[in-house]
């Protein structure tokens, strides 16, 4: 097995959960109610937290990648919709990398080559999922 080493660092992370909760005995589940929150809302809140944790601003980012199992829609891609919310007016590229459950790992691997090759210095990867809208919307 070949070992490949990358020279990159995860500077920060952020999370966001839906406001609506459902409790089953001793477990709490979070779900998005249609019309109240969106996948883009959750992504924007997670990005805000990640940038704060890293001590960065959106203007420090060279590329925005959405790495989710299910995107909001095919065209424009989810990353473009997130870009519109968190990076409006900035000219950084935005792209989706979707490999279902492994999207984040695939995105991290892919952007590591772009960073190593000098194309980008700081890439923001965000994964946002809203399974509750498709699994039991009522």
Spell out what each predicted region is.
Residues 1-24, 108-138:
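Conserved beta-strand-centric core segments of catalytic alpha/beta enzyme folds
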Residues 1-65, 86-87:
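Conserved "HGTGT" condensation-loop signature of ketosynthase/thiolase-family condensing enzymes
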Residues 34-37, 68-122:
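Conserved catalytic cysteine-centered active-site region
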Residues 43-44, 75, 103-104, 130-134:
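A short linear-motif detector with a strong N-terminal bias
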Residues 65-68, 127:
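A general secondary-structure junction signal
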